[in-house]
Amino acid sequence: MESNGGGGGSPKEAAVVVPSSGDATLGGHLARRLVQVGVSDVFAVPGDFNLTLLDHLIAEPGLRVVGCCNELNAGYAADGYARARGVGACAVTFTVGGLSVLNAIGGAYSENLPLICIVGGPNSNDYGTNRILHHTIGLPDFSQELRCFQPLTCYQAVVNNLDDAHDQIDRAISTAIRESKPVYISVSCNLPAVPHPTFSRDPVPYFLSPRLSNQASLHAALDATLAFLDKAVKPVLVAGPKLRVAKAGGAFVDLADASGHAVAAMPSAKGLVPETLPRFIGTYWGAVSTAFCAEIVESADAYLFAGPIFNDYSSVGYSCLLKKEKAVVVQPDRVTVGNGPAFGCVMMRDFLSELAKRVRKNTTAFDNYKRIFVPEGQLPECEAGEALRVNVLFKHIQRMIGGTEIGAVMAETGDSWFNCQKLRLPEGCGYEFQMQYGSIGWSVGALLGYAQAVQKRVVACIGDGSFQVTAQDVSTMLRCGQRSIIFLINNGGYTIEVEIHDGPYNVIKNWDYVGLVNAIHNGEGRCWATRVRCEEELEAAIATATGDKADSLCFIEVVAHKDDTSKELLEWGSRVSAANSRPPNPQ
C-alpha cells in the first residue's frame, strides 16, 4: 500500500497539523514525531495488527507510507533511508512481520543507524489473559518478539496503555537519534485511534542536548596526541566508518587540510570523506588496498585512525600489518594513544576540530607516496564482440559517475565490494555498502530507501545471487517513480563464497533477469531493462540509461564469466578462508 499516489521523491514539506483535543490520538502523535525528526517516508507491510496505525501515518501531511513486498526489504529500505536522511522508519505487523524484519534491524544495529521499527501489536485487552492469538507461536506469552528485538535495538517500547504511551514513544525515538541505533516500538492494534489528554497539546519539537566533552579529558588527549604525532617522521590519517555516527566528517577534513598528512579511508568509510582531498591516497584494506596505499600506511611510524572498526573482513582475516603502539585510535567518545593512556568522555568531533588547530604540518608520508606512485596503466579494453570483462564494466561505470547526475553508488556484498572500492568518487557522490553485517540481498531494499531520500540518481552494483534474495522490491522502486541504475552482474553464483570455500551450493539457477524486470514492470511506470554481453552493448546501454531513459528505472544485466573476479577478491577470500579455518586452540 502507498499513500499520496505512490509518486517518486519525498513529499513536500508540510506544516505539522495540530489536532484538537478531541482527535489527538496516539497514531497522530507518533506520525508527527516521525516528521519532526526528519522522516518523510515509512516503509511498511500491512497486517491486521497495524492497519489502523497505518491509517494515521497516511493521514499525516508530511508523511508517506511506502508499501514494500516483504518485511525484510522494508527494513533494508529503512536502513538505506537512514544512511541518506539520518533516520529511517519501517512499520510491520506482530511477530510474523517483526521476526521477518529482524535481520535488517541487526544490520542497522551493526552499522550504527538510527532506525525506528514500529510493530502493530495485539489488542491491549489480550495482554495477561492467557489467550492464544494468531501471528504468535501459539503461547499465551506475547513477549517472544520483544525478546528477539532486545539484543538488536537500544530501546524497546511496548505500548499497551495510553497513560504512558506519550512518554514511551518520545523516549524511544529520542533514544534512536541520540544513540544512533535501532529502536523497537510495539503499539497495540486498538490504541492508535483512541484520543488521550496527553496528546492534546502541540508536541514540543525535540531538542536533544548534544553530548559534551569533558574539557580536562579533551585537553589531556590533545596534549598526548600532539606529543605522539610530533615525534613521528611520517604520520598518516585513516578515516573509519564511525565518522558517520560521530558526525565528524567535516572535522576530519579540517584535520587533513591542517596536518598535511597522507589521508586514507578504511573500506567501510568510503564516501564519508571526499576523495578529492589533495593528499588522499585511497582505500586502506590491508593486502587488498588501493595500489601503494598499504605501503604508506603500514610503513608509517604513527597513524591516527578516526572511528575504525577492525574485524576479520576489514583486516583481511586479521592480516593487516599494523602495530598498536603506533596508533592513535579516536572513537566517537574516546581516544587511545598507543598502548595507553586512554581518555574517555572525549567527543570525536571536538577532538578532531581542536587537533586541527594545533597540529604541526607534516607532508612526509604524502611526499613518499608521490615518489613511489605509478599511475595506472592502460585502461582495459575488449576486442570487438569479445565477451565482456568485469574490469571493463567498471571502467565505464567510473566514466558514468563523473558527472553531476549521480548522487551515490551502492555495492552489494560480493565482488562489487572490491570493484566499487576502486571507483574514484567525484565531489558530493556518496558510497554505501554493508561491510560489518554483510547480508546478501541488502542492496535491493537499501537502494529503494536511499533513492527515496535523495533527488539524484543512485547507481547499484548487485550480483545475481544477492539479487535473487530480495528482487521483489524492484516493484516498489517503480511504484515510487525512482530513476536508479542497477547493474546486475550475472556470473552464475555466489562468487564471494566461491573464493572463500567453493562447493556445489555456490551455484545458482540462472534467471531471465531482464524478463523478470519486464514482468514486474508490466507496463506500469517508467522502466527500461536490457542485457549486455560485450563492451559495445554496454556502451550503448549506458548511453541510453543516461540519455533517452534518464527519467526511468534502468536495469542492465551484465553477463560475465563465472571466474571473472577482481584480484582483490582472490587475495581477500584466501585470507578470510585461512582465518575461518584456524584449528581449535589446544585445551
From Swiss-Prot:
Cofactor(s) for this UniProt protein: a metal cation; thiamine diphosphate
Enzyme kind, highest EC tier: lyase
Binding site for substrate: 48, 135, 497
UniProt key word Metal-binding: yes
Sequence positions that bind Mg(2+): 464, 491, 493
Segments for region (Thiamine pyrophosphate binding): 415-496
CDD domains: TPP_PDC_IPDC, TPP_PYR_PDC_IPDC_like
GO molecular function: magnesium ion binding; pyruvate decarboxylase activity; thiamine pyrophosphate binding
Key words of the record: Decarboxylase, Lyase, Magnesium, Metal-binding, Thiamine pyrophosphate
Textual note on the cofactor: Binds 1 metal ion per subunit.
Enzyme Commission number: 4.1.1.1
Record's catalysed reaction(s): a 2-oxocarboxylate + H(+) = an aldehyde + CO2
Biological-process GO terms, alphabetical: aromatic amino acid family catabolic process to alcohol via Ehrlich pathway
One Pfam family matching this protein: TPP_enzyme_N
InterPro entries: DHS-like_NAD/FAD-binding_dom, PDC/IPDC-like, THDP-binding, Thiamin_PyroP_enz_cen_dom, Thiamin_PyroP_enz_TPP-bd_dom, TPP_enzyme_TPP-bd, TPP_PDC_IPDC, TPP_PYR_PDC_IPDC-like
Assembly behavior: Homotetramer.
PANTHER family: PYRUVATE DECARBOXYLASE (PTHR43452), PYRUVATE DECARBOXYLASE 3 (PTHR43452:SF5)
Family assignment from sequence similarity: Belongs to the TPP enzyme family.
Entry protein name: Pyruvate decarboxylase 3
Native source species: Oryza sativa subsp. japonica (Rice)
